[in-house]
């Protein structure tokens, strides 16, 4: 299992968020059935009467299974799905340079994790597929951390930006520029996208490669100020 955030996910997870409710299919998969925005990021298992019977784990970000603030009802969390953790583990060990990433992260490309294997899905079924859930780590208290396929791709985007030595404002401008290009209007990415990107960015910036690059840029800036 890939433990994001340097084997310490609590360092980079968001402190506040939403709660989520799921129903148990009895085969290791859970269907998202309810949820709301508040400070509780727990994923509660509920029975057919809506009574809470346990806690599956916690969400990676406050919006992991929400799309533009709307709960993606019917999306499936598969506790046996290791594809996201494997993707991020490989991405961390074989991080592409930022230009290679940009060329291969567009819709349908190899780094567009949310759409890998989507087939001919469209509309709401495609949206549920993009928000399919999987375990991405375990926090210091032993709680399982679950994220969506969309989270995985956005985390990777932030990671490569942070590891490349970009500042957050630079990365944010790039992400929003691409979103504006796709939307054919000036706009910013949504809260769900930004939250996962920021977690990945922090992890990338604090990686063994990201730290020296960032420190070098800071040193250069300080030198320029004293000229």
Q: Where are each of the predicted segments found?
A:
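Membrane-active amphipathic alpha-helices enriched in small hydrophobic residues
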Residues: 1, 153-157, 193, 199
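Short turn/helix-capping motifs enriched in Asx and small/polar residues
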Residues: 1-67
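Catalytic Zn2+-binding segment of zinc metalloproteases
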Residues: 16-17, 159-170, 202-209
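Hydrophobic alpha-helical bundle signature of multipass membrane enzymes
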Residues: 61-185
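Active-site or metal-binding loop neighborhoods of secreted/extracellular toxin and effector enzymes
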Residues: 171-227
